UniProtKB/Swiss-Prot annotation:
Keyword annotations of the record: Cytoplasm, Transferase
Active site per UniProt: 169
Protein name: L-carnitine CoA-transferase
Species of origin: Escherichia coli (strain K12)
Note: Some strains of E.coli, such as ATCC 25922, can metabolize carnitine under aerobiosis.
One Gene Ontology term, aspect cellular component: cytoplasm
Name of the encoding gene: caiB
């Protein structure tokens, strides 16, 4: 198979990935593949572009490094072109409502007839099967959080709150990436394709496991946090200093002992409630939990963030200033690691945003292209799989494909 024109880089060079989906979850999986060197083809509707394009800046990040194909993959010759593309594809990712592809005649079995080694990742809110009440429902970030038990754990004591920005979308997209790579590893061993059923609510159920395990195995439901503080452990979470906010984790025997000396609670060390060797202070079960919070709040309120960071570094207590977005660019760690970078958009503008992550030492990812326009690569992709100029124009004339104007 000849690949589309692009530089060769990253650990996934030579891999062809195709995705069909809008907004964030499915496309985020495609984005990860593209930044790690895979050739990634983004399928869009012919009549209507991906709704993410209405955003002024985010799509320049989320759709960089992609090849844009505008094709009606469910109808007549458009479907034929899609199935022909699948013959040269390693991984296909689709994000839709339940078994939408199967309902429209593109089943796993149809895809495997054209490519027995194909890895297929289905991403939906409620999965490919289950009850009629849920399986075919639309889902976005907040829906998955609400249905999974994740949302009810977040917020404050007075009200639950979803975790933003769009946490369920990103977790689900990354799950699709890792699951597809795991499946590909097995396919290369056996020669037999795989189909993956990723339900967003199940992803968030798994991500919300920490506190829920206490309920499933004893009936204890963790309270929500108060003012950003850990619902279980004293000295953990968000705290206010004299000049702003920090987060801290008071964890460890020595850390607790030395911190208690600073905040005036050394006399509690070695008591039945806080015996020697205590590594965490449970804010509910320990009767001194509220007192620890009171003393810690008072001590922090009289010290600046710089003073707290210096002292906590001496005590080996993990803490960090809560950075504002403008502070990110000038932070020395960001600068040293080039965590924020710039690239050129397709119309020649400069765009700034997060760099490739993670950092591969021997086969690094790279940004080689900005977000392509709607249908920008349709002709090149169709030519790559054997279509002539006349074939392409016929698809366009029938409204089954769109090429760049």
């Amino acid at each position: 198979m000849d690949h589309l024109p692009m530089p060769k880089f990253g650990p996934l060079a030579g891999l062809r990935v195709v995705f069909s989906g809008i907004e964030i979850a499915g496309p985020f999986a495609g984005q990860m593949f593209a930044e790690w060197g895979a050739e990634v083809i983004w399928i869009e509707n012919v009549a209507w572009a991906d709704t993410i394009r209405v955003q002024p800046n985010y799509p320049q990040l989320s759709r960089r490094n992609l090849h844009a194909l505008s094709l009606n993959i469910f109808k007549d010759e458009g479907r034929e072109a899609f199935l022909k593309l699948m013959e040269t594809t390693d991984i296909f990712i689709e994000a839709s409502k339940g078994p939408a592809f199967a309902r429209r005649g593109i089943t796993d079995e149809v895809l495997w007839q054209h490519n027995p080694k194909l890895v297929i990742a289905h991403l939906s809110g409620f999965g490919q099967y289950g009850t009629e009440e849920y399986t075919n429902l639309p889902a976005y970030n907040t829906i998955a959080q609400a249905f999974s038990g994740y949302l009810i754990q977040n917020g404050d004591v007075d009200q639950p709150m979803p975790a933003f920005p769009y946490t369920a979308d990103y977790f689900s997209g990354l799950t699709a990436t890792t699951a597809a790579l795991a499946a590909l590893h097995k396919v290369r061993e056996t020669g037999k394709g795989e189909s993956i059923d990723i339900a967003m609510y199940e992803v968030m159920l798994r991500m919300g496991q920490y506190f829920m395990m206490d309920y499933f195995n004893g009936g204890e439901m963790c309270p929500r946090m108060s003012k950003g503080k850990d619902p279980y452990y004293a000295g953990c979470g968000l705290y206010k200093c004299a000049d702003g906010y920090i987060v801290m984790e008071l964890v460890g025997i020595t850390q607790i002992e030395e911190c208690f000396k600073d905040i005036g609670l050394a006399h509690l060390l070695g008591t039945p409630e806080i015996p020697e060797g205590t590594q965490l202070i449970h804010r509910i079960e320990c009767p001194y939990g509220p007192l620890v919070e009171e003393k810690l709040d008072a001590w922090l309120a009289t010290h600046t963030i710089a003073e707290v960071k210096e002292r906590f570094a001496e005590l080996n207590i993990a803490c960090a200033k809560v950075l504002t977005v403008p502070e990110l660019e000038s932070n020395p760690q960001y600068v040293a690691r080039e965590s924020i970078t710039q690239w050129q958009t397709m119309d020649g503008r400069t765009c700034k945003g997060p760099n490739i992550m993670p950092k591969f030492k021997n086969n690094p990812g790279q940004i080689w292209r900005g977000m392509p326009s709607h249908g920008m690569d349709t002709a090149a992709i169709l030519k790559n799989i054997g279509y002539s100029e006349n074939d392409i124009q016929e698809l366009v004339s029938k409204g089954l494909a769109k090429v760049e104007d």
